A protein has these predicted regions:
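Short, basic, helix/turn surface patches
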Residues: 60-71, 124-134, 251-254
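Short, structured secondary-structure boundary patches
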Residues: 55-63, 87-94, 120-126, 241-245, ...
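A short, terminal or domain-edge coil/loop segment
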Residues: 61, 91-100, 154-162, 272-291
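Catalytic adenosine-cofactor/nucleotide-binding cores of aminoacyl-tRNA synthetases and other
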Residues: 45, 104, 203-204, 214-292
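N-terminal Rossmann-like or analogous alpha/beta NTP/dinucleotide-binding catalytic cores
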Residues: 1-116, 199-200, 204-217
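Active-site cores that bind ATP or allylic diphosphates and position pyrophosphate for catalysis
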Residues: 107-237, 244-249
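Alpha-helix initiation and N-capping motif
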Residues: 53, 86, 105, 119, ...
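Structural motif
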Residues: 14-16, 173-176, 252-254
């Protein structure tokens, strides 16, 4: 059975870009008569905002989206909150070839959050180090192999992670599990078959496929959809409060009007306000055209 998911982080108000990705992931699940799962990626505790998770649920419900499993309603693979799953990540980590790394916090401070920008390659400083003067992170020993995969939107992608990123962190030196490992473990455990997410995460995919291979598991199908940008072409971020769903709701826009606007932002020929279920055929045409 098709199993898709939307996995937001509770670090602020959901903006238009998040909403469009959620809409597309929901449409993909419903077009395929599958399950739509909500998972909360809250490992970055320093940036987590109180009440953000509940606001995400309210925004999704207001938009007209429903889900079959999630952190609010539970399901077969609960808990659906990453901060409640550390023992699972620790268990999976023992199955990987790893080594401790005591490089400075500056080198590793961003690995808990999903990465959105190009990261510098790690030089392997601690690969052969046997003693450490301070607390250590845990790095996955990346093999020198080329990873090739076909993305449902972006086409064929190839990358040698050892050449581009090097050995990457799976646990930070403060004990927090990193995005790459947690994401893969959760998708495996929740039996996710298809991952539709923003193109800002395309660069994470080869690393995640390496982890799937290390676990002798089959990766899901990936679809990295275009990001919604502002008039300057910049990716929308949660700091753009004027574009948050909460603010738009308070301004008086209706969910059907916003759904129409999101559809139009994808180039879909939708003129009237509509419910998400009215876009199923549009999504079929769009995803087929995107896959070429």
């Amino acid at each position: 059975m098709f199993r898709g998911r939307f996995a937001p982080s509770p670090t602020g108000e959901m903006h238009l870009g998040n909403a469009r990705t959620a809409l597309l992931a929901w449409l993909q699940a419903r077009v395929n008569n599958g399950k739509f799962i909500l998972r909360l990626e809250d490992l970055d505790t320093a940036r987590t905002r109180q009440g953000a998770a509940d606001q995400i649920l309210r925004d999704l419900e207001w938009l007209g989206l429903d889900w079959d499993e999630g952190w609010d309603i539970g399901g077969e693979f609960e808990p659906y909150i990453q901060s409640e799953r550390p023992d699972l990540y620790a268990n999976y980590a023992t199955r990987l070839e790893t080594y401790p790394c005591s490089c400075s916090r500056k080198d590793i401070q961003n690995v808990v959050s999903a990465p959105h920008n190009t990261e510098p390659r790690y030089a392997g400083t601690c690969r052969t180090r046997t003693t450490h003067a301070r607390a250590t992170a845990l790095r996955f020993r990346v093999p020198d192999v080329e990873i090739a995969f076909t993305d449902g939107v972006c086409g064929t992608i190839t990358e040698n992670v050892q050449n581009t990123i090097g050995d990457f962190v799976i646990r930070r030196n403060d004990g927090a599990w990193a995005y790459q490992l947690a994401c893969v473990v959760d998708d495996l455990e929740m039996q996710i078959t298809d991952v539709l997410r923003g193109q800002d995460l395309l660069g994470s995919t080869a690393r995640q496929i390496l982890l799937y291979k290390a676990f002798n598991a089959k990766p899901p199908r990936f679809y990295h959809v275009p990001l919604l940008t502002d008039f300057q072409g910049k990716r929308l971020a949660k700091r753009d409060h004027a574009l948050s769903i909460k603010t738009l709701r308070q301004s008086g826009i209706s969910p059907s009007e916003l759904t129409r606007d999101l559809a139009q932002s994808l180039g879909w020929k939708i003129n009237a306000a509509c419910h998400p279920k009215d876009l199923l055929e549009c999504f079929k045409i769009w995803i087929q055209a995107s896959s070429g």
